[in-house]
């Protein structure tokens, strides 16, 4: 069974092909970062237009990379939500049109289930059950994962996602969009303990997150440390970046520890764009070492949005007999707990 996967939920156009026998045989990705950088964030209309321009050429490239033709494809999976409605509609329309033309089934995949299952593409894949930390620009969630589709939401951000807080704070520090990776780089030269940021919602029970206050705290810290010219010294920028990053990471770790204690699991999966953060990976590895558990990640290129995770998640469900009718419909908001469980 060979599945074509299409990802167009935000500002990356991803196309991949997953082969049941060979694994991932093609992976193509186009990022719109340069285009949106001029605006300091994703412009939905521009994102949709660019997906229209890029998706079909990437599909052709993926088929070429895998040395396949359209007649070899057994199903088409696409991101149906959550995400930007216009961007989702582009991928959905193209996927359904191809599925109809090729006379194969189509399936709308949940974007965050794709992220959650991305570590399954690695040689050292986790076994069920496990706790998943899904941490990106749009989501910060802790999920009890018993099997594919058998999910219980343990906690989530009540305001800004962790990745969103990274990008907003990076902008306050004068870094270009997207600022998460740039802030992490700046933090490498930071001085520990010069600034102390709060660890939001860690002083109370529960597994929910809140990161909007950290951005406000960062803004106040920046304003309080401007020099006579109204500028931040470079070392001060590094120190603020360090303090902010540590606050986010320690908050995530505290909540992960609680989730593992609550479930009794010894396996932790971390996925989503922020999971590429080196310091977060290091500190979570230390946590799991302390409790005698294991932590699993996707490779860095599969931390951000990509077609590979959609092709794989789609393969699992299409193989199980699921498919979506030919009507073009997307779900900009879509709780993952609504998904049906399947046996794998």
UniProtKB/Swiss-Prot annotation:
<dbReference type="Pfam" id="PF00814">
    <property type="entry name" value="TsaD"/>
</dbReference>
<feature type="binding site">
    <location>
        <position position="180"/>
    </location>
    <ligand>
        <name>substrate</name>
    </ligand>
</feature>
<keyword id="KW-0408">Iron</keyword>
<dbReference type="InterPro" id="IPR017860">
    <property type="entry name" value="Peptidase_M22_CS"/>
</dbReference>
<feature type="binding site">
    <location>
        <begin position="134"/>
        <end position="138"/>
    </location>
    <ligand>
        <name>substrate</name>
    </ligand>
</feature>
<dbReference type="GO" id="GO:0005737">
    <property type="term" value="C:cytoplasm"/>
</dbReference>
<comment type="similarity">
    <text>Belongs to the KAE1 / TsaD family.</text>
</comment>
<keyword id="KW-0012">Acyltransferase</keyword>
<keyword id="KW-0819">tRNA processing</keyword>
<dbReference type="InterPro" id="IPR043129">
    <property type="entry name" value="ATPase_NBD"/>
</dbReference>
<dbReference type="InterPro" id="IPR000905">
    <property type="entry name" value="Gcp-like_dom"/>
</dbReference>
<protein>
    <recommendedName>
        <fullName>tRNA N6-adenosine threonylcarbamoyltransferase</fullName>
        <ecNumber>2.3.1.234</ecNumber>
    </recommendedName>
</protein>
<dbReference type="InterPro" id="IPR017861">
    <property type="entry name" value="KAE1/TsaD"/>
</dbReference>
<comment type="function">
    <text>Required for the formation of a threonylcarbamoyl group on adenosine at position 37 (t(6)A37) in tRNAs that read codons beginning with adenine. Is involved in the transfer of the threonylcarbamoyl moiety of threonylcarbamoyl-AMP (TC-AMP) to the N6 group of A37, together with TsaE and TsaB. TsaD likely plays a direct catalytic role in this reaction.</text>
</comment>
<keyword id="KW-0808">Transferase</keyword>
<feature type="binding site">
    <location>
        <position position="115"/>
    </location>
    <ligand>
        <name>Fe cation</name>
    </ligand>
</feature>
<feature type="binding site">
    <location>
        <position position="277"/>
    </location>
    <ligand>
        <name>substrate</name>
    </ligand>
</feature>
<dbReference type="InterPro" id="IPR022450">
    <property type="entry name" value="TsaD"/>
</dbReference>
<dbReference type="GO" id="GO:0061711">
    <property type="term" value="F:N(6)-L-threonylcarbamoyladenine synthase activity"/>
</dbReference>
<dbReference type="GO" id="GO:0002949">
    <property type="term" value="P:tRNA threonylcarbamoyladenosine modification"/>
</dbReference>
<feature type="binding site">
    <location>
        <position position="167"/>
    </location>
    <ligand>
        <name>substrate</name>
    </ligand>
</feature>
<dbReference type="GO" id="GO:0005506">
    <property type="term" value="F:iron ion binding"/>
</dbReference>
<feature type="binding site">
    <location>
        <position position="305"/>
    </location>
    <ligand>
        <name>Fe cation</name>
    </ligand>
</feature>
<keyword id="KW-0963">Cytoplasm</keyword>
<feature type="binding site">
    <location>
        <position position="111"/>
    </location>
    <ligand>
        <name>Fe cation</name>
    </ligand>
</feature>
<keyword id="KW-0479">Metal-binding</keyword>
């Amino acid at each position: 069974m060979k599945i074509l996967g299409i990802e167009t939920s935000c500002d990356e156009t991803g196309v991949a092909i997953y082969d049941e026998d060979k694994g991932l045989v093609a992976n193509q990705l186009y990022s719109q970062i340069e285009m949106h950088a001029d605006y300091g964030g994703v412009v939905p209309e521009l994102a949709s237009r660019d997906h229209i321009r890029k998706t079909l050429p990437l599909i052709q490239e993926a088929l070429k990379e895998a040395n396949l033709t359209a007649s070899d494809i057994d199903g088409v999976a696409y991101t149906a939500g959550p995400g930007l409605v216009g961007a989702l509609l582009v991928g959905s329309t193209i996927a359904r049109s191809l599925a109809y033309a090729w006379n194969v089934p189509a399936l709308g995949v949940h974007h965050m289930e794709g992220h959650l299952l991305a570590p399954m593409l690695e040689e050292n894949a986790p076994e069920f059950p496990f706790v998943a930390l899904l941490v990106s620009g749009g989501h910060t969630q802790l999920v009890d994962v018993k099997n594919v589709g058998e999910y219980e939401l343990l906690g989530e951000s009540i305001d800004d996602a962790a990745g969103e807080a990274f990008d907003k704070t990076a902008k306050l520090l004068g870094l270009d969009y997207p600022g998460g990776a740039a802030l992490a780089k700046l933090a490498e030269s930071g001085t520990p303990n010069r600034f102390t940021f709060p660890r939001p919602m860690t002083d109370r029970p529960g597994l929910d997150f809140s990161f909007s206050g950290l951005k406000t705290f960062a803004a106040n810290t920046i304003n309080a440390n401007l020099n006579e010219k109204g500028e931040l010294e470079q070392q001060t920028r590094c120190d603020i970046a360090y303090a902010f990053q540590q606050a986010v990471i320690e908050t995530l770790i505290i909540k992960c520890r609680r989730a593992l204690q609550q479930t009794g699991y010894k396996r932790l999966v971390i996925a989503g764009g922020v999971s590429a953060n080196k310091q977060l990976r290091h500190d979570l590895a230390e946590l799991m070492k302390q409790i005698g558990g294991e932590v699993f990640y996707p490779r860095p290129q599969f931390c951000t949005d990509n077609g590979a995770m959609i092709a794989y998640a789609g393969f699992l469900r299409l193989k199980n007999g699921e498919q979506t009718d030919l009507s073009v419909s997307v779900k900009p908001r879509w709780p993952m707990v609504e998904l049906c469980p399947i046996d794998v």
